[in-house]
Amino acid sequence: MLDPNLLRNELDAVAEKLLARRGFKLDVETLRKQEERRKVLQVETESLQAERNSRSKEIGAAKARGEDIEPLRREVNTLGEKLDTAKAELDQLQNEIRDLALTIPNLPDDSVPLGKDESQNKEVTRWGEPRKYDFAVRDHVELGEMAGGLDFAAAVKLTGARFVVMKGQIARLHRALAQFMLDLHTQQHGYQEAYVPYLVNHATLYGTGQLPKFGEDLFHTNPLSEEAESSQYALIPTAEVPLTNLVRDEILDEESLPLKMTAHTPCFRSEAGSYGRDTRGLIRMHQFDKVELVQIVRPEDSMQALEELTTHAETVLQLLKLPYRKVLLCTGDMGFGSTKTYDLEVWLPAQDTYREISSCSNMWDFQARRMQARCRSKSDKKTRLVHTLNGSGLAVGRTLVAVLENYQQADGRIEIPEVLRPYMGGLEFIG
């Protein structure tokens, strides 16, 4: 959520920047009217409160003098009713202002290139050379089925489309990838591993920005009876959601920052709006595993932290010897809450292209303001909002796809990357 003071004092400038850099049309007229009315109600409630307090004191003085206090009592009661009405109207208006503010995307950093869509993203670097094959390349679906490890038909029977059943050595390889990523990030990159709930409440989803705007992308639980919103849950679309919300409503000592957390979880997404896209294989699933990286940092450290976090995700690809490229997303392709995002795209031989395998974002104070996540300096004891960052380190299913396709042999076997062999009992090939 953007700084309310920014919306109050620089509304036109913010609207202009959002339109130019995000293509987002801010409802300036409504915001301006709401702010004008808020100021009037604020003054009115403060005036009524002061007058009621003054009259209440007069009751005591009049009573001490032996005077009739009933007229004053009636006046105080009338003032109280007016104050309650004004407060209720002010509360309702502030909720309306907040509801509108929750739909406004974050402002892009000035270093982010202008652009309407992914075609205008900026390639930053490439690592590794795509392998040349002297045989017909198979895709991961064919390779996985040849190994008896990917069963999409069974998943359709159990659940439906965009799910998979993994078996045997393919399931083991999938597990090995996640374990390798966790060990790397915890033992070499300084992250603390966390086990988090896969179901979260609505307040948590508001905190990281999935609600109210992206509710249709979530899988929600449906209580059998009407219950309060606080008791309704949704499956997590990413471990970013529970990990980041661990600092919600907290005041952290600045000396304890950065906080670096990682978790391996399944992720659940409805893929609303993705009908007909990537219908074959593991690329776009309703349920997939991911190792997530989250950092909570001081505001002045967040841009450097983004570079560091992205490097941590890149290290996974480099150790697996998977060719990839690093892309800086343009303003039109960035996520709702991000101020700057790098995508890592891995080479997939069967598609003859690079595909996203990680997205690393600096959310600035956008999530922290929603969550009221703050830090306090030991020197002056003042509090300020933290900055939050997140990234995939990596998407496990897509990494499995990349390993299957990049390490395939002419006979359909899959060579196990060297760094994964200790997790596979020394196995060198699958199939």
UniProtKB/Swiss-Prot annotation:
Pathways per UniProt: Aminoacyl-tRNA biosynthesis; selenocysteinyl-tRNA(Sec) biosynthesis; L-seryl-tRNA(Sec) from L-serine and tRNA(Sec): step 1/1
The EC number(s) this enzyme carries: 6.1.1.11
SUPFAM superfamilies found in the cross-reference section: Class II aaRS and biotin synthetases, tRNA-binding arm
Compartments (UniProt record): Cytoplasm
Pfam families linked: Seryl_tRNA_N (PF02403), tRNA-synt_2b (PF00587)
UniProt: ATP binding residues: 269-271, 356-359
InterPro entries: aa-tRNA-synt_IIb, aa-tRNA-synth_II, aa-tRNA-synth_II/BPL/LPL, Ser-tRNA-ligase_type_1, Ser-tRNA-synth_1_N, SerRS_1_N_sf, SerRS_core, tRNA-bd_arm
A cellular component annotation (GO) from this entry: cytoplasm
Domain of life: Bacteria
Binding site for L-serine: 238-240, 292, 392
Single biological process term from Gene Ontology: seryl-tRNA aminoacylation
Keyword Mitochondrion recorded: no
HAMAP family linked: Ser_tRNA_synth_type1 (MF_00176)
Role, per record: Catalyzes the attachment of serine to tRNA(Ser). Is also able to aminoacylate tRNA(Sec) with serine, to form the misacylated tRNA L-seryl-tRNA(Sec), which will be further converted into selenocysteinyl-tRNA(Sec).
Free-text comment about domains: Consists of two distinct domains, a catalytic core and a N-terminal extension that is involved in tRNA binding.
Family of the protein in this entry: Belongs to the class-II aminoacyl-tRNA synthetase family. Type-1 seryl-tRNA synthetase subfamily.
PANTHER family reported in the protein's UniProt record: SERINE--TRNA LIGASE, SERYL-TRNA SYNTHETASE
Subunit field text: Homodimer. The tRNA molecule binds across the dimer.
Record-given protein name: Serine--tRNA ligase
The organism of origin for this protein: Pectobacterium atrosepticum (strain SCRI 1043 / ATCC BAA-672)
